[in-house]
Amino acid sequence: MKRLFIALLPLLLTFAAHAQRPTDIWYFGQQAGLTFAEGNTPKPLNNSKMSTYEGCAVATTAKGELLFYTNGETVWNRQHQPMPNGHKLMGMGISTQSALIVPDPGSGNIFYIFTVAPQGTPNGLRYSIVDMTRADGLGDLPRVNLLLIQPVAEKLAAVRHANGRDTWVVAHRWNSNAFVSYLVTADGVAAKPLMSNVGSMNTGPGRNAIGALKFSPDGRRLAAALWRETNKFELYDFDRSTGKVSNARGFGPYPEAYGVEFSPDGTKLYGSCNGVGGGTTQIWQFDLKTKAAALVGKSANRKIGAMQLGPDGRIYVAREDNPNLGVIEQPNLLGKECKYVDEGLKLGGRRSKLGLPAFVVDPKYGVRSKKKNVMSSAAETSRLW
């Protein structure tokens, strides 16, 4: 019996981890929403009170029950009402990744909302604290807009530390080639970041600050979209133990590069771009084994934006002012076999803008199989390049 238990222990731990569903609820765009809680096909939600052109974030319980959501300016509770002190956060919904929510590793009731201002403006990178024990369990913000660093680009991403407990929050300085990695522990948010000078300068006109930042599912790589006038995607290595970003590689030119996302198995990188001024919307796939680039999709929409991996293993693509999301159905597959569907998911009468919600990447969480309601982990993704 003891041998059987030892043999089954890894499987039991895997299922315990995957019973947690922190990315099942999405709110974004023009009061649009989705739930992934009822199987492999997401269903529209029409109860959102949030309008945001770009950035947004959602907090849930580990079981996927809504706690609150934000566009980086206002925070709404689970009853879709603004929190009492949740009106004046200093991110903006017109920033690519205006908000990101990180749970406090030492508490089930405290959350940090990180915000970045648009186009390298002085508001910079800040964080606000949400305490879910306040307002009769609906939550409120005892402290808001605590400055970390300024100015920054519109890039913001987070990944679980290698210890499986803490979290790295990564942004990019403006007028610099420096990534800044802040560690969030049970003691709070680190006052000083680890800086990594690597890759392209983020500088020039304020619009050059536009573009997303994403971690791979295993947390070992980081990708960025660099908008005008750089017009490219960059890939980096990331050390989850130290927070260091290194080894920059570029793909380009891709005019008005905006969104980035990795395939569930980490072997492909996807990027969205719109052409100068919009109107030439394209989705590119980069094979990280061969470095080959393939045009895998075009959109009838004038502009496309964020790309977000869903818990169902599909990648969803924001289409500006549109009642449908684009969907990459099989993102692990090479070239057009990945099957991009431009009007892939109806939003129940609501409209997408350019953003989709940001989440902390945790390698212990996987994606649900489309054929069976089981999970596959990113932990075994092989290192490439």
Residue ranges and their predicted role:
Residues 1-23, 256-258, 384-385:
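Bacterial Sec-dependent N-terminal signal peptides
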Residues 20-379, 383:
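Beta-propeller fold recognition
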